Amino acid sequence: MAVKIRLTRMGSKKKPFYRINVADSRAPRDGRFIETVGTYNPLVAENQVTLKEDRILDWLSKGAQPSDTVRNLLSKAGVMTKFHDQKFSK
């Protein structure tokens, strides 16, 4: 099973709000997911992002692939650097 970390759109028309979910890559964008690991609100001035870093690092170590947008959000939050250090420190 190929697992992706990607955004799921929530909110109403013209007011998007996103959850960062871990889901099977074959599932629809807003369909079934395994776990919610964060949120992203692009409408706030500083683009509010909340993350469960320990769960994200766990899923990345298990082989989950982040989407391009999620990879950018994780990089800005410093999670990808932690994952890289954790992976190559062995």
UniProtKB/Swiss-Prot annotation:
SUPFAM superfamilies named in the record: Ribosomal protein S16
Keywords for the protein's UniProt record, in alphabetical order? Ribonucleoprotein, Ribosomal protein
- Superkingdom, natural source: Bacteria
Q: Locate the transmembrane regions by residue number.
A: none
Q: Name one GO molecular function term.
A: structural constituent of ribosome
Which cellular component appears as one GO term in the record? cytoplasm
Q: Which GO terms describe its biological process?
A: translation
The UniProt entry's sequence similarity note says: Belongs to the bacterial ribosomal protein bS16 family.
Check the record and name the HAMAP family matching this protein.
Ribosomal_bS16 (MF_00385)
Q: What is this protein called?
A: Small ribosomal subunit protein bS16
